[in-house]
A protein has these predicted regions:
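Radical SAM/AdoMet-radical enzyme domain recognition
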Residues: 2-122
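A C-terminal junction/extension of Radical SAM enzymes
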Residues: 128-208, 247
Length: 248
């Protein structure tokens, strides 16, 4: 499916004076040399999904027989990152209530030889035992501070790494769209389901309230699109007068 979509996209580029940038996310299980070669040729960026240290990843991502996936996927990811010259990829982790010490996971990625990484908070039903609660926020903020100190320390030692959420250009800032809204959901970003349904973002898939349309009909629910357009820094009282509103 991926190969067919890329081929189809490439066939449209010249006639429409466009250049597609494709990105692939993989959990690594089916990753092999052929897929790596294809991605290195066609994918502008790849996301290597690894939930954290061995014990964290294997707790959240076991195989059906209960065994962990860490030992299978990490060597593949290391090989893949090297094949891309340690550029144009991210090792993406997820922190939950099980690993609020997620700085250790990012540091672990660096110790494995990865140079491009990201760590995102889990989105989960509040009833799940791993769901993040409001009471966890102070600990999470402290953890970002701890990670920042280690980040600076390693940069000074000549063994630095890139952490996606610390990459802020204070001189130029991000593009105008990101400065205004931060998120492109429903305006410059769409999620397409295997059935062709269009949603503002993958987080909304399955929530019929946010169904925008279909690949056959195009966007028909323009009210939702307009609602997302109005979500910007000037519409948020806590943001509109903040000095960091265009960098946050």
């Amino acid at each position: 499916v991926v190969k067919q979509l890329v081929e189809y996209g490439r066939s449209l580029e010249e006639a429409n004076h466009k250049k597609f940038r494709f990105t692939l996310t993989t959990n690594g299980v089916l990753l092999n040399d052929e897929i790596m070669e294809f991605c290195n040729h066609e994918m502008s960026n790849v996301v290597l999904s690894l939930d954290g240290r061995r014990e964290i990843n294997d707790k959240m991502r076991p195989f059906r027989n209960g065994s962990g996936s860490y030992d299978m996927i990490v060597p593949k990811f290391q090989k893949f990152a090297e094949s891309r010259g340690q550029k144009n990829y991210y090792v993406r982790g997820t922190f939950t209530r099980n690993n609020l010490d997620f700085a250790d996971d990012v540091i672990h990625y660096a110790d494995l030889g990865f140079q491009q990484m990201s760590m995102e908070p889990v989105v989960a039903d509040p009833s799940e035992d791993y769901a993040i609660k409001e009471e966890d926020i102070p600990a999470i903020l402290k953890e970002y501070d701890r990670l920042a100190l280690e980040y600076i320390k390693r940069k000074k030692e000549g063994r630095g790494f890139n952490f996606f959420h610390f990459m802020l250009d204070l001189k130029a800032g991000p593009c105008v769209a990101k400065r205004m809204a931060g998120c492109g959901s429903g305006t410059e970003y769409l999620a397409v389901t295997p059935w062709g349904d269009l949603y503002p973002c993958h987080q909304f898939v399955g929530n019929e309230k946010f169904l925008l349309g279909n690949v056959d009909t195009g966007i028909v629910n323009t009210d939702i699109r307009d609602e997302f357009k109005s979500c910007n820094v000037y519409a948020k009282p806590g943001c509109k007068d903040c000095f960091a509103r265009f960098y946050c």
